[in-house]
């Protein structure tokens, strides 16, 4: 059902842009599960556009169809350029897209130049080391925050962002990125670990962080991954924290998907509470990886 809806929705977006925003939009692009083969019956379509004018931003829409949430959002050329320079973690939004509308051949060529630049950067060892270091340092700053007095939901959110940053660091360090997004990040990290000389503990601590039941476990295991990845890519950190040993393995993919999705949702709920005064929801207080 979702696939049929999504296919119709793509046609609707194309027609709406051509009919109402032809002069206002540079490009409309699809990415994510709809084009990479990881869609399930509850998948949306991941779609963004690059505006040409202020009016173009009016194309942005958030809505629900058949119980599935959709978000058609804008991204400017500057942000796309930052992604190509590996300064952002949204690399598939430039590297793995299907363009369904372009204002002109020149706009298309401009985007293709960004893709070529990104490909060049992914082959440049110096650029990759700097990008990996930046992500590891960002993870360390999050770790410093996680060690402050925080409720469980905040600790779980921070721990989730720590391991996502570190997974990105490992992937970029190895001339790659997660083409299939958060949904398959752990599986792709395991695959990368088997193909490259990546410490297995990186995967173990990633999984233990997701499975953590207490604040102390979340802190300990996210820091365990921080130490392991930092040592692997040559970034040192000043603090030490005892780490325990654990077993790794591929648990149900749904667990990782739900955990990281919950982390991202918690961030959005926190932003809405802070910016708009909406009611506060601490959904991560109730997350249990083995009781979904």
Where are the language model's segments positioned?
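Short amphipathic alpha-helical segments, especially helix-boundary/capping motifs
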Residues: 9, 115-121, 143-145
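Internal, well-ordered alpha/beta segment that forms a basic, Gly-enriched binding/recognition surface
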Residues: 77-134, 138
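Intrinsic-disorder-associated interaction segments
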Residues: 2, 6, 100, 104-107, ...
């Amino acid at each position: 059902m979702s696939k049929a809806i999504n296919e119709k929705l793509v046609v609707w977006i194309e027609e709406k842009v051509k009919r109402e925003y032809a002069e206002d939009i540079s490009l409309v692009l699809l990415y994510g599960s709809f084009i990479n083969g990881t869609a399930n019956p509850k998948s949306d379509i991941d779609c963004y556009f690059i505006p040409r004018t202020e009016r173009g931003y009016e194309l942005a829409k958030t809505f629900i169809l058949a119980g599935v949430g959709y978000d058609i959002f804008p991204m400017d050329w500057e942000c796309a350029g930052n992604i190509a320079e590996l300064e952002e973690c949204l690399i598939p939004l430039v590297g793995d897209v299907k363009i369904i509308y372009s204002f002109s051949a020149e706009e298309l060529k401009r985007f293709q130049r960004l893709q070529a630049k990104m490909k060049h950067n992914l082959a440049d060892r110096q650029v990759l080391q700097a990008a990996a270091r930046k992500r590891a340092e960002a993870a360390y700053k999050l770790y410093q925050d996680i060690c402050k007095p925080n409720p469980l939901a905040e600790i779980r959110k921070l721990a989730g962002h720590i391991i996502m940053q570190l997974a990105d660091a490992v992937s970029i360090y190895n001339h790659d990125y997660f083409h299939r997004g958060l949904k398959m990040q752990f599986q792709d990290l395991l695959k990368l670990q088997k193909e490259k000389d990546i410490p297995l503990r990186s995967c173990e601590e990633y999984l233990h962080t997701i499975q953590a039941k207490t604040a102390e476990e979340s802190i300990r295991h996210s820091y365990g991954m921080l130490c392991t990845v930092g040592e692997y890519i040559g970034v040192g950190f000043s603090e030490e924290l005892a780490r325990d040993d654990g077993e790794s393995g591929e648990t149900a993919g749904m667990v990782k998907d739900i955990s990281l999705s919950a982390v991202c949702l918690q961030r959005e709920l926190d932003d809405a509470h802070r910016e708009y005064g909406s009611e506060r929801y601490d959904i991560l207080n109730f997350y249990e990886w083995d009781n979904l």
